């Protein structure tokens, strides 16, 4: 497990909440925070030198560049694009500027190819293609020295020998960026699988407006970890057309990427409550009192 941080959005206690939820669900990690391992450090702020060195390496190889555009200029650019009804994206103003030695605030952007296509195989969706002209020169390293998700996930996954990347489908459109970073660095990319989103009853993306969204809030409401684990595992995945109740060991034994669906999964509180009640009725009085 590697903890990635966005300094501007850090919430006090968030890390402890995440780790606490994983521990409550018995989702133990082989290595990472609190455990250690051979691929540390496991906190992004302790890995900054890795991202910075790799970003500078890409600049030296003319695969990335310093961007000196101010936030004010970028705001005006976006407003102009909106007025002209143009798709949003960086206009590559700094792409061919010489790199200066002066200490001018800057970010590092990746030189994404303008022509052609970028394709990759998704284990759930098959071959996916993107026209390169739809992807802008994205920021890899911010002015404060912190990486964006695009750079951090490629560097961490490569250095930690990650073979499979399973993440929400909202990251599908970012995958061409990651594929090109892998290519630029000479890394072999992992296998990708983009999971369907969890939806509310109105079929929109699950959010706070749909009610409780924190795992630990459900714990505090009396839901059992076994029921929550079982319920979450069946959001977008199924063993067959009828099996609903499965123990953690059964879910682990039978899980396969091939049975993950493409459509979004509805978060049904009624089903979770039914499943929780079933697990409670199977427990002894002594187990319930623990």
What is the predicted role of each segment?
Residues 5-6, 159, 166, 279:
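A generic structural motif
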Residues 8, 173, 185-290:
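Catalytic adenosine-cofactor/nucleotide-binding cores of aminoacyl-tRNA synthetases and other
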Residues 15, 48, 52, 71-74, ...:
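Alpha-helix initiation and N-capping motif
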Residues 35-38, 160, 212:
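Short glycine-enriched loop/turn motifs at secondary-structure junctions
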């Amino acid at each position: 497990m590697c903890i990635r941080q966005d300094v501007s959005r850090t919430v006090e206690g968030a890390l402890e909440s995440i780790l606490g939820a994983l521990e409550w669900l018995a989702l133990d990690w082989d290595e990472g925070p609190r455990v250690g391992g051979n691929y540390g450090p496991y906190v992004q702020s302790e890995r900054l030198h890795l991202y910075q060195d790799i970003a500078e390496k890409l600049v030296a190889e003319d695969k990335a560049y310093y961007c000196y555009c101010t936030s004010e200029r970028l705001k005006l650019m976006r407003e102009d694009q909106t007025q002209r009804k143009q798709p949003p994206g960086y206009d590559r103003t700094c792409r061919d500027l010489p790199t200066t030695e002066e200490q001018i605030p800057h970010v590092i952007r990746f030189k994404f190819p303008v022509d052609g296509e970028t394709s990759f195989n998704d284990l759930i969706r098959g071959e996916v293609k993107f026209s390169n002209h739809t992807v802008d020169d994205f920021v890899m390293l911010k002015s404060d020295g912190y990486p964006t998700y695009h750079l951090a996930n490629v560097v961490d996954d490569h250095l930690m020998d990650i073979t499979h990347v399973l993440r929400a489908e909202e990251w599908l459109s970012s995958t061409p960026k990651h594929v090109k970073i892998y290519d630029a660095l000479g890394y072999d990319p992992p296998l990708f699988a983009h999971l369907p989103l969890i939806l509310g009853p109105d079929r929109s993306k699950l959010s706070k407006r749909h009610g409780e969204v924190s795992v630990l809030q459900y714990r505090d409401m009396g839901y059992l970890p076994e029921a929550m684990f079982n319920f979450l595992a069946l959001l977008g995945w199924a063993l067959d057309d009828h099996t609903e109740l499965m123990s953690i060991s059964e879910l682990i034994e039978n899980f396969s990427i091939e049975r993950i669906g493409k459509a979004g999964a509805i978060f049904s509180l009624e089903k979770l409550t039914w499943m929780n009640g079933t697990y409670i009725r199977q427990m002894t009085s002594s187990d319930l009192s623990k």
